[in-house]
Amino acid sequence: LLSRRQRQMCIRDSTADAFVLRGAKIVYVDIRPDTMNIDETKIEDAITEKTKAIVPVHYAGVACEMDTIMDIAKRHNLKVVEDAAQGVSAYYKGKALGTIGDFGCYSFHETKNYTMGEGGALLFQDENYLEKAEILREKGTNRSKFFRGQIDKYTWIDYGSSYLPSDMNAAYLLAELEEHEKIDRKRMAIYNYCLLYTSDA
């Protein structure tokens, strides 16, 4: 997303690495103690003329106040990149987390709600980002076009990495997603149990 220095982001530190690697300057915004999410009332004070995006983290699958965040982004002409790493199958006012902003990111790391050991998914609203996403996924090459027969050879275009999961890992993830309602019920039962026995502490 960012490749020039001195651009700024409003973001949590656990999400910062991807932006720092592209030369962005990170601006931290404090959290709300009730949700552990970004405090939407403090975002505008952190915005400068160099700010390019707001990156809300839906901590533990609890939704940030996306209406307010999207309104701020619109007024300041900023992109919104949702870190929905823990937000698969979680919603904000009927909308799936990761599908509200310009971009959404899911994680399938072993510590997340649904896992294939590693990896994730990138969602975006504007289909013009599709080619860039494919290049990032294919080690910085236009290999996807080659496999579709759109070009006769592929080459390096930009930076990227090897983000393609193995068939086996994808099969693990698919099996979990097919059981998402059962998994969600179990997680909610554990949450309610913990809440019940810690509320008096």
Where are these regions (language model features)?
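Generic leucine side-chain signal with a strong bias for well-ordered alpha-helical environments
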Residues: 1-2, 78, 177
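Single conserved hydrophobic/aromatic residue that forms the stacking wall/gate
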Residues: 1-7, 11, 197-201
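Short glycine-biased active-site loop of nucleotidyltransferases that positions the nucleotide triphosphate
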Residues: 2, 95-98
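PLP-dependent aminotransferase-like
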Residues: 5-84, 91
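Short loop/turn motifs at secondary-structure junctions
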Residues: 6, 50, 99-100, 116
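Active-site region of PLP-dependent enzymes
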Residues: 87-93, 100-199
